[in-house]
Amino acid sequence: MEFGIFHEFLTTQAGSQAEAFRNSFAQIEAAEEWGLDVVWLAEIHMNPTRSLLTAPLTVAAAIAARTHRIKIGTAVQILPLGHPLRLAEETATIDQISGGRLIFGVGRSALDRKSVV
């Protein structure tokens, strides 16, 4: 059995976006230190009062550079919003950077279709 955390990179009332990113990265680094196996990243668009996580693959690359063991999963990457070749190249690159720790989860999203740009 594996244990992990689901992270949305929540915004904070009291701080800047940079502070919210720093806090989230610190939580993930702590999760690795505590022995958790995986961090799952959401993809959340058009909701800046809730989450900063609009680019989970970019964040996954940053996590890969900051950690050594914890697996990094997308839960979920919204396929209709990305070009297939670009997604394939980015995921392959992050998997190499992370030493094979990327778990690429895809889905349709919970976005209202009217809100998709």
Please place each PLM-identified region on the residue numbering.
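N-terminal beta1-alpha1-beta2 module of alpha/beta enzyme domains
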Residues: M1-R66, I70-K71
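Flexible, glycine-rich active-site loops centered on histidine and acidic residues
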Residues: E2-E19, P80-V117
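Structural motif
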Residues: A42, A75, G105-G107
